[in-house]
Amino acid sequence: MNDTLKQIGSTGIVPVVVLNKADDAEPLAQALVKGGLPCAEVTFRTDAAEESIRRIAKKFPEMFVGAGTVLTTEQADRAVGAGAKFIVSPGLNPKVVEHCLKKGYPITPGIMTPTELEVALGFGLDVVKFFPAENAGGLKMIKAMSAPYTMMKFMPTGGINATNVRDYLACNKILACGGSWMVKGDLINAGNFAEIEKLTREAAAIVKEIRG
């Protein structure tokens, strides 16, 4: 496992962020750092994503910022060019995975079936995103797939919350969980970064409680 994935694993929870305005990037990053989760997956669902990553990477070098919802090789290049330290995609697009590996970008593609998992193994990956986690069978499905694929670690995302994250984190097949409950869009849009910091601190406490 590469150092990037090890750092994600040490964080335990990766806040999955949707930013509509790049001006929200710095106060959000500050809230996450102060709350104890200096990590963020900024999704490429908005026009502000690239600039948001750039601002976070520049202002908060201690922040482990990556890009999520990366669907194309061009998005991957833009994200890394802006300062993203890792790439996450919702599905497994062989073209995107191959491009990222060739360029040396840490890539975690999404899977939800054993067939997709085997494709990931074929690329030499040892961590995959399990998405959409809860709708795709949750922890029960991950444990079932782990039986024949003992070498693979998972980063479940989708439907993870402050309640069920404990069960996921307690499983030794889980590298980290992606979640957005501490960075909800309405809180970001309202500029309520104090509440985001509070929720982030609570999330970080869960990681410490479960993993020590």
PLM features: residue spans?
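Glycine-rich beta-to-alpha transition loops that act as phosphate-gripper elements at the mouths
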Residues: 18-20, 67-73, 89-93, 109-114, ...
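Shared catalytic-loop signature of beta/alpha-barrel
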Residues: 135, 140-155
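Catalytic cores of alpha/beta
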Residues: 28, 72-82, 115-123, 160-176
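Conserved N-terminal beta1-alpha1 strand-loop-helix module at the mouth
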Residues: 1-82, 102, 151, 162, ...
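Glycine-enriched alpha-helix->loop->beta-strand junction motifs that scaffold or abut catalytic
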Residues: 33-38, 59-62, 80-87, 102-108, ...
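Glycine-rich phosphate-binding active-site loops on the catalytic face of alpha/beta enzymes
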Residues: 90-96, 129-139, 173-195
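Distinct, well-ordered alpha-helical segments
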Residues: 25, 53-57, 121, 142, ...
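Histidine/lysine/aspartate-rich catalytic loop segments that bind and position anionic ligands
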Residues: 93-127, 131-136
